[in-house]
Design a protein with these regions (language model features):
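Extended, subdomain-level signal for the structured scaffold at the beginning of enzyme domains
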Residues: 1-101, 114
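Short, thiol/selenol-centered motifs that function as redox-active sites or metal-ligating centers
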Residues: 108-109
Length: 114
């Protein structure tokens, strides 16, 4: 699977919603023969550690400012309690750019409201 899959992480992220997806993308065990597992990179508005709804602390690997749309295979937007807040506008704008460039955007649960 060419390109990188970016997982957006943020305070209040619903950490349980990404478990099956990230496990299968990372392992590639159910991919068609010949396809390699996906590279998943955590992406944050900045590199400040976030706290998920389940209390996990995650430090984003890259910030939104460092993100390169050109090597993006997909963007995963997990659910959470802050999707209607102004703080999410920058990632929603980037998600719109992904869609314009025919990149996959996977919005889960609360992320569909953004």
């Amino acid at each position: 699977m060419a390109g990188t899959i970016y997982l957006y992480v943020f305070d209040t992220m619903a950490d349980w919603e990404i478990g099956f997806l990230t496990a299968e993308l990372n392992s590639g065990r159910f991919f068609r023969k010949g396809l390699s597992p996906a590279k998943i990179v955590t992406l944050g508005l900045d590199k400040t550690p976030v706290t998920t709804m389940g209390g996990l602390k995650i430090t984003p690997e890259i910030s939104l400012a460092e993100w390169n749309l050109q090597n993006t295979k997909a963007l995963i937007l997990p659910g959470g309690e802050t999707w209607l807040e102004d703080t999410q506008k920058p990632i929603l704008e980037m998600a719109a750019e992904c869609l314009k460039e025919n990149r996959l955007v996977a919005a889960i649960c609360g992320a569909t409201m953004g």
